[in-house]
Amino acid sequence: MEAQVENAIQIAFDPTSSQQLRGQAVEFLERLRSEGSAWQASLALFTRDPRPSDIIRHTSLDLVNNAVQEHRLDEQSLAYIKDTLMSHVRQSYAPGSSTADTSHIQNKLMQTMTYLFAALYPTSWRSFFDDFRALAGDQATIGNVNTATTFLYLRMLVQVHDEIADQLVARSKEETDRNTHLKDLIRDNDIQKIALSWQEILAKWRETDLSLVEMCLRTIGRYVSWIRLELVINQDMITTFLEMAGQQGISDPESPAGKVRDAAIDTFSEIVGKKMEPSNKIELILFLNLPDVVGQLITSPALAEFNSPNYDNDLAETVAKLVNNIVFDVVKILENDNVDEQTRQRADDLIRIFTPYLLRFFADQYDEVCSTVIPSLTDLLTFLRKLQKKQGTVPPQYAAVLPPVLDAIIAKMKYDETADWGEEGEQTDEAEFQDLRRRLHVLQQTITTIDESYYIETLSRLVNGTFSGLSQGDQSLNWRDLELALYEMYLFGELAIRNQGLFAKREPSSVAAQHLVGMMNSMIDSGLANYPHPAVQLQYMEICVRYYQFFEQNPHLIPKVLENFVQLTHSSHVKVRSRSWYLFQRLVKHLRAQLGNVSYDIIQAVADLLTIKAELPDTSEDEMSSDEEDQSADALFNSQLYLFEAVGCIASSNTVSAENKKLYAQTIMSPLFVDLEQTLPQARNGDDRATLQIHHIIMALGTLARGYSDWVPSNNSSAVPHSDVADEFVKASEAILVALESLNSSSSIRHAARFAFSRMIAVLGSRLLQQLPSWIEGLLSLSSSMDEISTFLKVLGQVVFTFKSEISNILDTVMTPVLQRIFSALATTPSGTDDEIQLAELRREYLNFLIVVLNQGLGSVLVSNTNQSSFETIISSIENFARDTHDAPTARLAIFVLIRMINVWCGPDKVGPGANQTPTSPATTQAPLPGFENYVVERFSPLAWSIPASPGFNSKDAQAKQVLVEAANLQTEIVKKVGEPYVERLKSDLSGNGVAADGVDQYVRTLAGALEGTKKEKEWRNFFVQFVDRMLSGRG
């Protein structure tokens, strides 16, 4: 067996073995693992002399591990494994032995020993710790003579802790109970001896292997969370910790001495982090003399020499962690209302001592160090906020904390002196800095809630002071100072325009708003817009857009700010240029009513940017680039579209005459028409770049249309665009249709045309209807995908809604072609998940389109002479969807369509509160459809039974229940509109299904009650769901 196991391991890990042979070997080893039967052979392999290779020993020990942990071996077998492995350890790790295991074999061995410990320590191996301690030697030899066995001893201690006390590992209740019992046994029997061994190792730390010292400290750090602190907190141990933590002159933080120093400080952190009573925690911090310890560490050369090669950021992060833990605990004590006065006073004293330390690390040049103390600074500020809310003010001893904290936050908000904004390869650093800024902003917001007036005063001083310095030519200012002022000014808006706009009745709406207005004036006066750094330029534009209301109240400043924006739209910096196009559109959209006589000048100033030059995508471009960093040709064109929308907004301003609106439209679109005409022949011949150029032109025309009109399709037609302007966009629509007809097989052209069509609605008004058949023919071609048809149906529904009073005749003409294209797509068999999703979406959009037609009083189109041939297909498709058990949302929607048809075509209610009343809504004022009541009884009423009878229908499923609720609503609508004939049909159906006479009466009575009000209607729905459930259960 031994040879078989060894051979299998060799084959499994030999890369030269054939795949088939390796597969067989792996399968054999997995079988041994699952059976747990090869542990004897594996144990023998591991301990064999001469030793096999490490991979064989490691895998063999893993098989032993598996048997110990998973197969519940009897105690005799476990004892045999224990004795065999301990014998191996004694031989291999004896002083002077040259056969010690490699590091990864040691770790595996200690894992096995830990599993054996968990199984045997409570019963038959109480000497577990003593056995390993004996290997490490007595007080004289532990650590500095028997180094290998001391390492092994500490490894064992670490493994035991990780197995039974690691809080980060999720465990079952059974494991938790076992671990609690084991920890109790260790605390009762061995922990004092273990603590003594730590003391013995550390007592001679200066002459001991420093890696061993570090490991000992890390081990103590693990154990302090669940042992009595007095075992490690005594004067000798604390003196040793302080000696290690206070080492000076360490040039390399990664050296053994540096690691020991950091481990000692981490041990302090773990000790401080131990849960205990508030008074005991304060006593502990003072006993450890941590105020002086931290103070000395901060003034040591390794932390005092900022911006020098000697600065040790690893040490800074380690001490910051200690400070963070101390402040966290002290704040928790201060928040505790049950703390005695002496403890509270001591905690107050500690906060005063540690706040400067906290701010020292918060302001550290390294963001990693700063981030380490943000949690405790957050806790401190949260405590002050609660105190302010509770007492109405912050006590003086705490109020003094706020100024240095806010100053430190603002300082950390500033770009580092070494930062190179926008440079290649800086994206990761930039992302990390912005993440830090977001965290700092949260702290700043907390300070605002504690002392709003101080925050306003501080930020105003910073921003106005910076802009004043710029105005006066202060040479010490750089882009980082200006960007910080603008960034803080941007954030300031959260307070200044929190509850309302910047102005109320032409006056600043709050004190903060008043200060923000002052900042805006300072910014404008400083000439900051001309500062050449891209980060400043971007923030300037963001500020102008965010606070556009300032310009509404100061219209004399609008020409200048627009001039600045126009300059920035021509920036040579690609990020500034592309972002400015978007922000320019945002600004002019807000200010279009105040543009006045400058409209033409602005359009002329950006006209050179409206030239479209399509570029085929470069396959080497990084497809994973973020939207902000994307500088591809496609991304730049998408930004360019904002310019077209912007000039549309400018050209259609209320301050522009109708004559000029038409002129501007001609000026902007004429070059596009010429380009389209010249490029179309090349695109017809299959030129990909020409096709992309046509796509871009169509998108630009659609986007211009969106900018050109404020009109939102609704029942109000008062804002329909001026006819002269509409004439120009009719030409645009015709040009797009020519391109669409020529390039109909191109999905990108269809996409662009669909995009433009939906945006032409607002500028063409009802003129669009004359072209609707051509649009439908182009956009619902045989090449169109299901996704395209779904999207177009949404737009067509919008057209129907918008022009319901004028569209009837045209809709009657186009309905059958539209339905035929839909039916053709619905009949497609999906070939994958994406197709299934698109098909489900198409079904829903088709049903929604029918609902729009019915709701807008256009139901007669569906049954007209022109479209009557499609009516049966419509009804059949709806019935099929209603019975589809795999798509409950669509099934519910399908039933709802049937309910709308009944409501529209069956005339007035026959029974219920609305019986014989004259209908008033557009949907129900349509003429009843002769004979439709009988059709409903024959065709729709059976669905109540055929839906739950459909294969796969599960009445217990939540979504299926919702379908049944809709089926109940269908029956309510039928009985309301048809009356007695339907009731008789129901009785017949129920009796035919084996329902007793009293059951039939109850069913009919409950259904009739649904017409009496909301409560009864709900009772009927619940009754029907339960009725179907009982019926299906009976059949089962």
UniProtKB/Swiss-Prot annotation:
Entry's PANTHER family?
EXPORTIN-T, EXPORTIN-T/LOS1
Function, in words:
tRNA nucleus export receptor which facilitates tRNA translocation across the nuclear pore complex. Involved in pre-tRNA splicing, probably by affecting the interaction of pre-tRNA with splicing endonuclease.
Q: Which organism is it from?
A: Phaeosphaeria nodorum (strain SN15 / ATCC MYA-4574 / FGSC 10173)
**Primary localization:** nucleus
Domain of life according to the entry = Eukaryota
Name the Pfam families for this protein.
Exportin-T (PF19282), Xpo1 (PF08389)
For this record, an example GO cellular component is:
nuclear pore
Keyword set includes Metal-binding: no
Q: Where in the cell is it found?
A: Nucleus; Cytoplasm
* Keywords tagged on the record: Cytoplasm, Nucleus, RNA-binding, Transport, tRNA processing, tRNA-binding
The question of whether Cytoplasm is a record keyword is answered with yes
Q: What is this protein called?
A: Exportin-T
Q: What are this entry's molecular-function GO terms? A: small GTPase binding; tRNA binding
Lineage, uppermost ranks: Eukaryota, Fungi, Dikarya, Ascomycota, Pezizomycotina
> Which protein family is it in?
Belongs to the exportin family.
* A GO biological process held by the record: tRNA processing
